[in-house]
A protein has these predicted regions:
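Charged, glycine-rich intrinsically disordered N-terminal tails and low-complexity linkers that flank
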Residues: 1-100
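Catalytic cores of nuclease domains that cleave nucleic-acid phosphodiester backbones
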Residues: 2-12, 20, 27, 86-156
Length: 156
């Protein structure tokens, strides 16, 4: 299901620079002042400063660990392929749940209907009750810097 970005707060608190920037989620490309892809996204810039996660190298090291002989160890008896699948499945389910939570909070603050009976969303409800003095200005705000040629999105 495609995420439809709610617009209540961005319309209410419109900024002239909002009209200069757009984002294509699939290829992760910003267009700024008509320049498509000429600005580096902050996400891309951040990733350039860290080594990519190397599951194979980490699992190879784990398989040599004495822990792998312990029947109580959660990876005991698992092959490299099985461990990698466990990690991939956990990554995917966590990402899906996190994205849903993020979107539901965004919908809530933009006066959209939200159907989420998860424990985590109830924690968000508690946060709202405990912090009723906080008033959202924007839930997402696309920004850019002309000289640095950086673009990104600030999320609440």
């Amino acid at each position: 299901m495609e995420h439809v970005v709610p617009t209540y707060l961005s319309t209410k608190h419109h900024h002239p620079r909002d009209d200069d920037i757009s984002f294509e989620e699939g290829p992760h490309i910003y267009t700024v002042c008509g320049d498509r892809g000429g600005f580096t996204s902050v996400t891309t810039w951040n990733h350039s400063h860290f080594a990519q996660f190397n599951a194979d190298a980490i699992i190879d090291k784990m398989l040599k660990s004495p822990k792998m002989k312990d029947p109580t160890y959660k990876y005991y008896g698992k092959t490299k392929k099985q461990i990698k699948k466990m990690w991939d499945d956990k990554r995917d389910s966590s990402s899906t749940a996190g994205t849903k939570m993020h979107n539901d909070i965004e919908y809530y603050y933009n006066n959209e209907d939200v159907k989420n009976d998860s424990l985590e969303f109830s924690y968000f409800g508690n946060f709202i009750k405990d912090n009723s003095h906080l008033v959202p200005y924007r839930t997402e705000w696309m920004i850019y810097h002309e000289e640095m040629k950086l673009s990104g999105s600030i999320d609440m």
